[in-house]
A protein has these predicted regions:
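S-adenosylmethionine
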Residues: 1-176
Length: 182
C-alpha cells in the first residue's frame, strides 16, 4: 500500500468509520480505467465496434465503458478527435447525476481539466450556458482545450476566484462548489 500521511488516515478513519478497512484495502486493488463517450460525436452503442476490445459498460454511467487491461486509449486517434474522454469511473458520477436540464445555466467553479465540464455541456444539448471556471490559469487553458476538442458550445471559460464569481451564483440554476463540503 502507498505510504499515506497519518493526518489523512486519521481524518479518513473518522469520516468512514466501519468502512475504513475497506478503504485501505482499495489501495491494493488494481486501478480501474474508464472512458466516457462524447455523445455529441458518437452514440454510446456505436463506440465498441470502433475500437476492437472486450468493452464492458459502466453500469452507473450511461455513456461510460471500462477500459480493458492493456489498452492504451490515450494514443488513439479517436481520443485526439474528442470522441471520448479518459476518466476514472468514480469521477464520472457527479456530472452524470446532477439534476440539470437543457436550457439551464450551470456554474462549475472547479472545472479543469474538463471531465465534468464536457459531460455537463453535452447534457445541456447546445442550449443554456455552462460557465466553466478554474482558479489556475494553466488548468483553465487545459480546460479550454478539452472543451474545444469535445465540440462544446454555449460555454464560457473563466479564470477567476470563487469570490470573484459570487454574483454569478444567483444567475445560475446550479453551482458546483470548489469544495464538496460547501
Amino acid at each position: 500500500m502507498a505510504q499515506l500521511p497519518q493526518e489523512f488516515l486519521t481524518r479518513m478513519q473518522d469520516m468512514l468509520g466501519d468502512e475504513f478497512d475497506a478503504f485501505l484495502t482499495s489501495y491494493d486493488a488494481p486501478r480501474t480505467a474508464g472512458l466516457r463517450v462524447n455523445t455529441k460525436k458518437c452514440r454510446t452503442e456505436d463506440f465498441p465496434p470502433l475500437v476492437p476490445g472486450m468493452w464492458k459498460k459502466i453500469p452507473w454511467i450511461p455513456n461510460g465503458y471500462f477500459v480493458p487491461d492493456g489498452m492504451r486509449m490515450g494514443q488513439s486517434p479517436l481520443y485526439a478527435a474528442g470522441v471520448f474522454y479518459l476518466q476514472e469511473p468514480s469521477a464520472m458520477t457527479p456530472a452524470s447525476r446532477l439534476p440539470i436540464e437543457p436550457g439551464e445555466r450551470v456554474l462549475d467553479l472547479c472545472a479543469a481539466p474538463g471531465g465534468k465540464a464536457t459531460e455537463l455541456n453535452a447534457r445541456l444539448k447546445g442550449t443554456g450556458l455552462l460557465v466553466a471556471n478554474d482558479i489556475s490559469n494553466a488548468r483553465a487553458k487545459a480546460l479550454l482545450r478539452n472543451l474545444e476538442l469535445f465540440g462544446s458550445e454555449n460555454v464560457l471559460v473563466t479564470n477567476e476566484t470563487p469570490a470573484g464569481l459570487a454574483d454569478a451564483v444567483s444567475y445560475t440554476h446550479l453551482t458546483l462548489p470548489t469544495n464538496p463540503r460547501v
